[in-house]
Amino acid sequence: MFEKLSQAACSEPFAFLGPFIDPTQGALRVWMPGATGVALVLEGQPRIALEREKESAFILKADLNLHLTHYQLAIDWNGIEQLVDDPYQYHGIYAEYDDLHTPKTMYQHMGSQFMTLERDGKSISGIRFLVYAPHATAVSLVGSFNDWDGRRHPMQRLDYGIWGLFIPGLTEGVSYKFEMKGPKGEGLPHKADPWGFYAEQYPSFASVTYDHARYQWQDAQWQTRPVTEKRKEALSFYELHAGSWKRNEQGEFLNYRELAAELVPYLVDMGYTHVELMPVSEHPFYGSWGYQPVGLFAPTSRYGSPDDFKFFVDACHQAGIGVVLDWVPAHFPSDDHGLANFDGTPLFHDPDPRRGWHQDWNSFIYDLGREQVRRFLVSNALYWFEQFHIDGIRVDAVASMLYLDYSRSHGQWIPNMDGGNENYDAIATLKWMNEEVYKYFPNAMTIAEESTAFPGVSAPTFMGGLGFGFKWNMGWMHDSLSYIKEEPVHRKYHHNTLTFPLVYAHSENYVLSLSHDEVVYGKGSIHNKMPGDEWQQTANLRAYFGYMYGQPGKKLNFMGAEIGQTAEWNHDDQLQWFLLDFPRHQGVQALTRDLNHLYRNEAALHDQDCIPAGFEWRLQDAAEQSIIAHERISEAGERILVVSNFTPVPRDEFRLGVPNKGRYQLLLNTDDSKYAGSGYEVVVDVKSEAVVSEDLAQSIVLRLPPLSTLFYKLA
């Protein structure tokens, strides 16, 4: 046993260290590498020196029964004394089976947890560490409290593949990792805590102890608001990368609190309902934008502490802004300190690269056929809702999870048990995650980034769906951008590209997304996808945004689009805020603000987004003129007419059939001079006439500005 202890290879330290159960064998054994002496300290009694048994072992052979007695150790480090509680007197370090295997409670027990244990009538505070490493032959806790010496604190092998140890007296802010021996006794890289709540940056990547109970939330009014049906709400998401929205004068990141001070009033002014953060789970490589996470339970410390991130969410909620996080359960990177070969085996991924390795992203794929991996991920999703009060998660790369042959050629994948390409384990996991989230957090929302036609992504699980609340409409994004990139003179040949998305617009609960994916890897900015000179580019962009807000579906824009950013997004720099010195870009920002407020204020533009009753075509086939028109209809029967002219040719007397007799009043014109438009005179109030047009008995005559979208409300 001494040899195992000296090699940090002991799996049952409680059988050898601490108080002896049989006092005839002695009273106490202590293993303290590097110490020159150890003494027993009992309250109100003289100290008793322990004898050196081996080089690092000390033993007390007195006839004392310390099995139920609280004691301390006075350790002599070459003349410097340290008084500590002996961790190996605390046997009550475990938790109930259900607590360790139920997603809702796992994060309250695994990893590092502050707790108080009773011993000999005393309340002893400290931190209990639990880690799942079933194939390890030994696990030690190493950290700043023991000079990263794996011999000092061997952990006890418990049941169900879990190792544990309670360290009395530890406080917040202590760095730690796990030192393990693999199945054959081989040494492994030090591992960060998979359940760690806080982490350091390069070079240590160590986990850090953190107490969730300390932060005092101020968002009770938000948290207790009535449960609503999100499909009927106006949802406008501002997708944001925390490191590159704004920088300080030195070009450094804003921390979470500084970001809150700048961002929250901006979101309120601009009319957004939610901020959607690109992944904040700890990730070692900044250039991954968070999509290669290692610490799933830790908000990245690049921008501050977990308390600082809570402050950010708190500030958003107090201002009426919801917070959605990007969540990455599809894959994880191969960094040595992370989940890869965690206990010397492919614990979190399939050993067969045809199922366990993502060749596009050079990352491991979670093995969702393993119950403990599924629980780990579902627990992580619930954790962010409970501990950080988030309002939703946007699940990244769902298609890569659903299909075993995703981005793979013949021979590079393994079929399921029925010979197909569906990943049954991933499907079951996503369903379970959604059920758990909505069960415990009924006001939450889950959103899928799913790029295929997999059926029922946003259908309830009891109807055979995956159970997401919403799905990004990747088809709309692709088709609409493909259309708007065409020169106006050519758009008539691509008219069907613009109208086709309405064929399936209500097959899912859709979010119309113009995400970060569209402004990277040489794709350019949304602004620069527009054809023509500078004025036409901006006019096209305004018309396109108007068209987007008039279409059925919730809205998402990546940061920078709202100011007409001209450069492709660069995560190493802030947005081009200087563009707001120019009227054209001021106009795009002002339009985005007005579109958000219009969308939120007019029920017809949002409360039937997800059902066919909320949309009617008024003009679908005017390809030669590149004009479309439709009406949006609220549950209460309110109607808003949306007309888009995608050519630079103004239409002086454009007759359009309408189904209802009445007056149509202008709500918004994307070509208005206040948006730096042409200022072409439009009709602000028009009464329908009994003139047949488009097979409708009533019609109105409008003036359509060049490259514009108009909104009229039926009075």
From Swiss-Prot:
According to UniProt, the name of this protein is: 1,4-alpha-glucan branching enzyme GlgB
Q: Which GO terms describe its biological process?
A: glycogen biosynthetic process
Q: How does it assemble?
A: Monomer.
This protein's record includes keyword Glycosyltransferase: yes
In which pathway is this protein known to take part? Glycan biosynthesis; glycogen biosynthesis
Could you tell me which CDD domains the record lists for this protein?
AmyAc_Glg_BE (cd11322), E_set_GBE_prok_N (cd02855)
Report keywords, A-Z.
Answer: Carbohydrate metabolism, Glycogen biosynthesis, Glycogen metabolism, Glycosyltransferase, Transferase
Q: Which organism is it from?
A: Vibrio vulnificus (strain YJ016)
Write out the catalysed reaction: Transfers a segment of a (1->4)-alpha-D-glucan chain to a primary hydroxy group in a similar glucan chain
Q: Which gene encodes it?
A: glgB
